[in-house]
Amino acid sequence: MRCPFCRGDDSRVVDSREVEDGQAIRRRRSCSGCGRRFTTIEELVLSVVKRSGVTEPFSREKVVRGVARACQGRPVEEDALQQLAHQVEDTVRSLGVSELPSHEVGLAILGPLRELDEVAYLRFASVYRAFSSVEDFEKEIADLRSLRGAARLPEGPEAAQGGPESKAGNGQAAGSGDPEGVKAEKSSE
């Protein structure tokens, strides 16, 4: 590594650490010629290949801007957008490639955005997947509803038996007309 001070070619690594959650390596170096120390940061340059064939460096800020447009008017904090962009970057870096198509970045955005805000997800998906009809929206909404329903299914032995509460959800024991049934049932637990 060439010294930035004396331009000498001989330097040695004094310290080496991972930074940015392991996405880069920070090395502290010492020049054998002038004795001065300097720091280098090594990271994998992640490039995105656009549909036009143009290659550009991955930009977390560009992910934030794109998702922010989809979240316009929605109750989504800037911090949540930054976290989503970081999650997307981690996902695409974990693929282990130095170049990836922009399509892969879009796929990496969809999952976290769906969990962040469903309306913003629909907006983003409509552009990303080029929805061309109302039916495309209806299908995506139906998919969202089925995912939401699957995520909220009760678990455990009470779920199989219908649980201790009535279907009305009023806190009364099933088959009981008064709240005393709840107290008696809870005290026997």
From Swiss-Prot:
Annotated signal sequence range: none
Nucleotide-binding recorded as keyword: yes
Annotated zinc fingers (unnamed), start-end: 3-34
InterPro entries: ATP-cone_dom (IPR005144), NrdR-like_N (IPR055173), RNR_NrdR-like (IPR003796)
Domain of life of the source: Bacteria
Transmembrane segments: none
Amino acid composition bias (Basic and acidic residues), ranges on this chain: 180-189
NCBIfam families hit by this protein: transcriptional regulator NrdR
Name of this protein: Transcriptional repressor NrdR
Species this protein is from: Saccharopolyspora erythraea (strain ATCC 11635 / DSM 40517 / JCM 4748 / NBRC 13426 / NCIMB 8594 / NRRL 2338)
Gene encoding the protein: nrdR
